[in-house]
């Protein structure tokens, strides 16, 4: 689960990190009034969406009057912002963040992630702030400095100082950096973060460190014990199909291909997507119906897949271990009848009661294409999606 920038900065302030004074506003009038509360003669206005690249898309602007703030808010509130990180439809803008203007002498990067390889939280810092960390990692990885946090002792001030020396900070800035580092480490653990970025962490003209932006991702598996984080949830920023799938305990991720995939098991689902690609097709989604799939969930899975207008064919790939293939077959038949599937459906069943499942499909009287193997299924569904 991701947070908006204004929510991230609210947490930063609670943990004693230096952030700009700002207000998240729902209306143009409220945005203009926020400028009066902040004071000064120059402000920054930012659209609040769960995506990067806002500046290049026109979603961030430096303004010098309340009229400009109003115009910006009127232009964006209720509309969708399209960036390189969104799909073609973009993300809806429901809030505008109005902030005081901060002078910038230099831009740094500071972030943290859960590193699966070392099984630890790893902090990353770089002198190359203001650009994508992925780009830095690819082009100049030597400019990224890391500090692994030992889970037994937690973050230590000496680790912050080591990073600070590599960033070229002076003694005054070093003290500030240690405070920021320790605050972020505590916040990361307290709130069950999966990702944290301050990009950029700026050095002002006065030589002070300041958190100019904030990006936070919460570990979805920990939301149950984080009521405060759960309250930050903004469903408008999620794909409607993914949100609907979650209600049925279906793991669904929308993609941009034409072959809908319904599979039980995440590993098999990824393998199915790979083999569809191998045979010249493009998956329209990742969908894991799980080990406890029943007729109702299979039916909902079909509805979700077919709600994507790009889907030209559907591949159902089921390995019957916990779940019985004949039950899945009945679910497929019920779903096809209920939903009124108009695209070709290719089904491959293996495992518990696979023969019985195939027999059920064969006797259904529906136009369902049976596949003998995964390769056969991929070949048939790609051909069907291409209208062959």
UniProtKB/Swiss-Prot annotation:
- InterPro entries linked to this entry: ATP-grasp, ATP-grasp_succ-CoA_synth-type, ATP_grasp_subdomain_1, Succ-CoA_synthase_bsu_CS, SUCC_ACL_C, Succ_CoA_ligase-like_bsu, Succinyl-CoA_synth-like
Q: What is its EC number?
A: 6.2.1.5
Q: Which cofactor does it need?
A: Mg(2+)
One GO term of the cellular component aspect?
A: cytosol
Q: Which organism is it from?
A: Colwellia psychrerythraea (strain 34H / ATCC BAA-681)
GO MF term set: ATP binding; magnesium ion binding; succinate-CoA ligase (ADP-forming) activity; succinate-CoA ligase (GDP-forming) activity
Give GO BP annotations, semicolon-separated.
Answer: succinyl-CoA metabolic process; tricarboxylic acid cycle
Q: Which Pfam families match?
A: ATP-grasp_2 (PF08442), Ligase_CoA (PF00549)
Tell me what reaction this enzyme catalyses: succinate + ATP + CoA = succinyl-CoA + ADP + phosphate; GTP + succinate + CoA = succinyl-CoA + GDP + phosphate
Q: Which UniProt keywords apply?
A: ATP-binding, Ligase, Magnesium, Metal-binding, Nucleotide-binding, Tricarboxylic acid cycle
What Gene3D superfamilies does the record point to? ATP-grasp fold, A domain, ATP-grasp fold, B domain, Succinyl-CoA synthetase domains
The family assignment reads: Belongs to the succinate/malate CoA ligase beta subunit family.
Name of protein:
Succinate--CoA ligase [ADP-forming] subunit beta
Q: Which residues form the ATP-grasp domain?
A: 9-244
What pathway is this protein said to act in by its record?
Answer: Carbohydrate metabolism; tricarboxylic acid cycle; succinate from succinyl-CoA (ligase route): step 1/1
UniProt binding sites for substrate: 264, 321-323
Q: How is the cofactor bound?
A: Binds 1 Mg(2+) ion per subunit.
* Disulfide feature: none
Ligand binding (Mg(2+)): 199, 213
In which residues is ATP bound? Answer: 46, 53-55, 99, 102, 107
Described function: Succinyl-CoA synthetase functions in the citric acid cycle (TCA), coupling the hydrolysis of succinyl-CoA to the synthesis of either ATP or GTP and thus represents the only step of substrate-level phosphorylation in the TCA. The beta subunit provides nucleotide specificity of the enzyme and binds the substrate succinate, while the binding sites for coenzyme A and phosphate are found in the alpha subunit.
Per UniProt, subunit arrangement is: Heterotetramer of two alpha and two beta subunits.
């Amino acid at each position: 689960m991701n947070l908006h920038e204004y929510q991230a900065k609210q947490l930063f302030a609670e943990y004693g990190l230096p952030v700009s004074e700002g207000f998240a506003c729902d209306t143009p009038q409220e945005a203009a009034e926020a400028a009066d509360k902040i004071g000064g003669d120059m402000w920054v206005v930012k659209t609040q969406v769960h995506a990067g690249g806002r500046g290049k898309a026109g979603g961030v602007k430096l303004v010098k009057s309340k009229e400009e703030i109003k115009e910006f808010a009127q232009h964006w509130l209720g509309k969708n912002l399209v960036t390189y990180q969104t799909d073609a439809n973009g993300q809806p803008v429901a809030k505008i963040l109005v902030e005081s203007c901060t002078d910038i002498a230099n831009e740094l990067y500071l972030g943290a992630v859960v590193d699966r390889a070392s099984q630890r939280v790893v902090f990353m810092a770089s002198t190359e702030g203001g650009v994508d960390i992925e780009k830095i990692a690819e082009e100049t990885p030597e400019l990224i400095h890391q500090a692994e946090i030992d889970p037994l002792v937690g973050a230590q001030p000496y680790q912050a100082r080591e990073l600070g020396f590599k960033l070229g900070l002076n003694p005054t800035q070093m003290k500030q950096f240690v405070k920021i580092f320790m605050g972020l480490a505590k916040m990361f653990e307290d709130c069950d973060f999966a990702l944290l970025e301050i990009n950029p962490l700026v050095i002002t003209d006065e030589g002070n460190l300041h958190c100019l932006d904030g990006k936070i991702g919460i570990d979805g598996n920990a939301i149950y014990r984080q009521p405060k984080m759960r309250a930050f949830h903004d469903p408008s920023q999620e794909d409607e199909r993914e949100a609907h799938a979650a209600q049925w305990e279906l793991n669904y991720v929308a993609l941009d291909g034409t072959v809908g995939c319904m599979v039980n098991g995440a590993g098999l689902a990824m393998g199915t997507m790979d083999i569809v690609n191998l045979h010249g097709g493009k998956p329209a989604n990742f969908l894991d119906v799980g080990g406890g799939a029943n007729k109702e969930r299979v039916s909902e899975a079909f509805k979700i897949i077919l709600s994507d207008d790009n889907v030209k064919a559907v591949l159902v790939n089921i390995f019957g271990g916990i779940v019985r293939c004949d039950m899945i077959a009945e679910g497929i038949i019920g779903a096809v009848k209920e939903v009124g599937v108009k695209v070709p459906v290719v089904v491959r069943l293996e495992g518990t009661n696979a023969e019985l499942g195939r027999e059920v499909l064969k006797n259904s009287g529906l136009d369902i294409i049976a596949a003998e193997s995964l390769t056969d299924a991929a070949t048939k569904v790609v051909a069907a999606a291409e209208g062959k």
